[in-house]
Amino acid sequence: MKVMSTVPAVSMRRLDSGQYIIDFGQNMAGWVRMNVRGNAGDTIRLKFAERLNADGTLYLKNFRDALSEDIYVCNGSENGRPWRPTFVTHGFRYAMVSGMKSPKAEDFTAEVVYDDMATTGSITTSIIF
């Protein structure tokens, strides 16, 4: 897997719970790179979903018991250092962040990943699906 493109956050809004919903504007496979800020011991959580509930929260019913979450525990010296997870990919358009001090949309960038294989052909049809 290789990062093939990056997608900035389209919007970010605060929920009444204090968590933030980030919209990247398109569904993708990949992960979120974030600029980390926090005090030692702060736990930042990112949860992922492909759509939202009517109330604007993440729709997670399709995961059943599975977790789609990244967790970062701050050591207090990050000062905006970028971080991305390893050994995981998510299918998502939306991410919910909690535990981060004063997050901004520009702190989050989606990294789209897929196999780095050469394109060997294509097809065009007149049929619209």
What are these regions (language model features)?
Residues 1-129:
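Extracellular/oxidizing-compartment recognition motifs
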